[in-house]
Curated annotation (Swiss-Prot):
It is an enzyme of class 3 (hydrolase). NCBIfam families: PRK00393.1, ribA. Binds 1 zinc ion per subunit. Pathway: Cofactor biosynthesis; riboflavin biosynthesis; 5-amino-6-(D-ribitylamino)uracil from GTP: step 1/4. This is GTP cyclohydrolase-2. The active site is at 127 (proton acceptor), 129 (nucleophile). It comes from the Bacteria. It catalyses: GTP + 4 H2O = 2,5-diamino-6-hydroxy-4-(5-phosphoribosylamino)-pyrimidine + formate + 2 phosphate + 3 H(+).
Length: 200
């Protein structure tokens, strides 16, 4: 996807000061964000990176149905403590199916279906996300080698397929609560996420 760098600014946050950069698809107008720290000069060592898909309910409204909000906040803390890193915040709500369909899927989950089956019952893929914009964003930041903060092996492979050297995986297990235990188990059992059994 031919996204283009548009704008950048400093962004003070509750977790430290970052730089926020916006990238845009010139055809669709879709915007993605890189939240970075300590990358004023090209890095010489592998950089902490998280690829985080937009989750309005979790990131903005602190929903307990997922672990997205806690993952985002934990990553900001981790990067701030390390002094260097980047969050690629991709505008792919609901694993790429959009907000409306995500809420429809939530309604099916309320009836007892898991997160995978809920999407399939709506004739939608379990995961419709794309990651082809990541290499362009990381290249703009001069990041060539990454320590990927993820539990999702698909993200690791997606970055490798784009020529990004993923030298390590940093597990991220936060945000478990009674409302999302089944969701997390489904991600491990049906979506191959790299949680450990004792995480649950």
């Amino acid at each position: 996807m031919p996204i283009e760098f548009i704008a950048t600014s400093k962004l003070p946050t509750a977790f430290g000061e970052f730089n926020i950069s916006v990238f845009q698809d010139p055809v669709t107008g879709e915007e993605h964000v890189a939240l970075s720290k300590g990358l004023e000069n090209p890095p010489t060592d592998p950089v902490l990176v998280r690829v985080h898909s937009e989750c309005l309910t979790g990131d903005a409204f602190a929903s307990l149905k997922c672990d997205c909000g806690p993952q985002l906040q934990a990553t900001q803390k981790l990067i701030n403590e390390a002094g260097q890193g980047v969050i690629l915040y991709l505008r792919q709500e609901g694993r790429g199916i959009g907000l409306t369909n995500k809420i429809r899927a939530y309604a099916l989950q309320d009836q007892g279906h898991d997160t995978v089956d809920a999407n399939l019952l709506l004739n939608l893929p379990a995961d419709a996300r794309r990651y082809d914009m990541c290499s362009i964003m990381l290249d703009h930041l001069k990041v060539k080698e990454v320590k990927l903060i993820t539990n999702n092996p698909l993200k690791i492979q997606a970055l490798k397929d784009q020529g990004i050297n993923v030298v390590d995986r940093v597990p991220l297990t936060v945000g478990r609560n009674p409302f999302n235990e089944q969701y997390l188990k489904t991600k491990r059992e049906r979506m191959a996420h790299l949680y450990q059994k004792d995480d649950f």
